[in-house]
């Protein structure tokens, strides 16, 4: 990490911007892939059980839309993975043995599984048995879900690094337990929350397209039956997303308390802390954490944050100042202040430098063991050694605060939406002209994407300044590049990904507008 002494700070900013750009675009495609896979799998299952041509054609319609989206997700995902080697080479060197393992499994197992069965799903109609085709459809969705699992395992490890040990001889973190990495509680919660929220995206998409048909007085049976299925999927996934989100909040409170404090704009913690519902935060104000007060127009749910973070009404939740100044936990353990962690981090860096210098001269020097022991004690704070000002440890509060509320607010709205549209679809005649409901469904489509992206903004920006929590700050992970080169590729990716997004929207709109049920699909 010696290049940190000369690296241009703008390289860090451009590299972060490029990764954010590609990740946001990629995530426009992934949740729809996971969500549509469930809906079209259910529809084809009904066809398998009934043998009615209508269900066959319904499955094929949704599979066409799935195929377009699936292709775009693969294209944008490959570019995203390559960025670790180009823009974040120091990160790849430092933890490549660990981070690369789940991505390798994802590529070998999940991606090959998807590639194989997606071909059967699209081209196997009338060429393979109904049962084998149905299995291929479900296995395509399962492959995409397994792919998401391994990618989320890698991301969860960045949030909560486990199953590894630092080797001072190679200056790398090495995996000591694949099971700890793959089955991390943080990874499990992240996976289920991400997948269930993706099912939500798929359900909203199906409802929106179906309501467009009803608004145009077309394909009524396809629209009605699709809404019935999507409403159930959406209602179940809404409840599951809320439940898994609660589990994730508890994990964040334990492992990333600064992220939670930023999400709540909580400067001074305590017991029985309220959950802020509405507040006004000035995004342009220079933060003064020691003197920060509750934001104006502050409306909070009494003891709500303590309940969310600790599952206790009187649970203790630390604020920004508590985390910067150090505090005593309810169990009596003292948490170090930011300055103490930074000092131990600098000591770890100094011990590592001395260890490598001595080892280069004499690999049998008895002092090496002493330095290795000292380094192991200070290694949990290694990343803090690169922090110059404790204010750097606080994520940007306004964007985390509002993004979290957008995610939760839209999620709650979607739950109500699925209750209403499900009731109308199953208990009433939804094909009877209900313009207000059709327009509401169309409005929900952009909202669910905003909520989905907002969740990832909280997950990633709330972790800053860390690339790997407490272990490696973002500025230490970047490659030593010219800022102009990174800026150029940023705009190239912006153009490329925008073209891909426009292409997907145009192709999907073409498929939807020109779809006409064949005469054989009346039964």
Listing of model-derived features with the role each one plays in the protein:
Residues 69-139, 156, 461-465:
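Membrane-interface helix-loop-helix modules in multi-pass inner-membrane proteins
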Residues 154, 236-347:
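Aromatic-rich transmembrane-lumenal/periplasmic boundary elements in polytopic membrane proteins
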Residues 119-127, 132-141, 149-157, 178, ...:
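Internal alpha-helical transmembrane segments
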Residues 50-68, 94-100, 104, 124-142, ...:
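Membrane-interfacial loop-to-helix junctions in multi-pass inner-membrane proteins
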Residues 1-24, 51-58, 82-104, 156-192, ...:
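Membrane-interface interhelical loops and short amphipathic "cap" helices
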Residues 67-76, 138-161, 234-245, 441-459:
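Hydrophobic alpha-helical membrane-insertion segments
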Residues 30-39, 109-117, 198-209, 406-422, ...:
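Hydrophobic alpha-helical transmembrane segments
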Residues 388, 392-456, 487-511:
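C-terminal substrate/ligand-recognition segments
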């Amino acid at each position: 990490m010696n290049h940190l002494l000369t690296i241009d700070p703008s390289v860090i900013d451009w590299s972060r911007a490029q990764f954010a750009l590609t990740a946001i675009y990629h995530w426009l495609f992934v949740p729809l892939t996971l969500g549509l896979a469930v809906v079209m799998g259910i529809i084809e299952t009904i066809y398998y059980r009934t043998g009615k041509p209508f269900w066959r054609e319904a499955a094929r319609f949704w599979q066409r839309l799935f195929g377009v989206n699936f292709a775009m997700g693969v294209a944008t995902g490959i570019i995203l993975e390559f960025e670790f080697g180009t823009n974040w080479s120091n990160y790849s060197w430092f933890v490549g043995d660990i981070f690369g393992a789940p991505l390798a499994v994802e590529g070998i197992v999940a991606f090959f599984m998807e590639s194989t069965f997606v071909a059967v799903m699209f081209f196997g109609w009338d060429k393979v048995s109904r049962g084998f085709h149905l299995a291929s459809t479900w296995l395509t969705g399962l492959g995409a879900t397994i792919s998401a699992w391994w990618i989320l395992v890698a991301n969860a490890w960045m949030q909560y690094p486990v199953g590894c040990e630092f080797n001072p001889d190679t200056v790398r973190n090495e995996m000591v337990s694949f099971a700890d990495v793959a089955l991390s509680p943080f990874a499990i919660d992240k996976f289920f929350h991400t997948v269930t929220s993706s099912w939500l995206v798929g359900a909203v998409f199906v409802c929106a397209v179906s309501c467009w048909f009803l608004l145009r007085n077309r394909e009524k049976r396809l629209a009605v039956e699709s809404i019935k299925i999507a409403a159930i999927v959406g209602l179940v996934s809404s409840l599951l997303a809320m439940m898994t989100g609660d589990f994730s909040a508890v994990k964040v409170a334990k492992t990333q308390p600064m992220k939670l404090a930023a999400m709540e704009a909580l400067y001074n913690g305590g017991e029985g802390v309220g959950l802020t519902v509405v507040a006004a935060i000035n995004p342009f104000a220079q933060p003064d954490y020691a003197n920060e007060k509750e934001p104006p127009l502050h409306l909070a749910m009494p003891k709500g944050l303590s309940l969310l973070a600790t599952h206790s009404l009187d649970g203790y939740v630390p604020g920004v100042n508590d985390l910067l100044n150090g505090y005593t936990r309810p169990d009596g353990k003292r948490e170090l202040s930011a300055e103490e962690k930074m000092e131990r981090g600098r000591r770890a860096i100094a011990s590592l430098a001395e260890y490598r210098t001595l080892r280069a001269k004499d690999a049998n020097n008895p002092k090496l063991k002493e330095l290795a022991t000292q380094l192991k004690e200070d290694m949990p704070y290694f990343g803090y050694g690169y922090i110059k000002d404790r204010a750097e440890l606080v994520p940007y509060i306004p964007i985390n605060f509002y993004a979290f509320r957008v995610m939760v607010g839209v999620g709650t709205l979607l739950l109500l939406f699925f209750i209403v549209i499900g009731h109308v679809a199953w208990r009433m005649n939804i094909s009877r002209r209900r313009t207000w409901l059709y327009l509401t469904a169309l409005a929900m489509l952009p909202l669910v994407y905003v909520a989905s992206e907002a969740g990832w903004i909280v997950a990633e920006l709330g972790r800053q300044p860390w690339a790997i929590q407490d272990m490696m700050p973002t500025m230490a992970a970047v490659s030593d590049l010219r800022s102009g080169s990174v800026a150029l590729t940023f705009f190239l990716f912006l153009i490329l990904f925008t073209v891909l997004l426009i292409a997907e929207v145009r192709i999907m709109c073409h498929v939807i507008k020109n779809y006409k049920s064949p005469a054989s699909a009346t039964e």
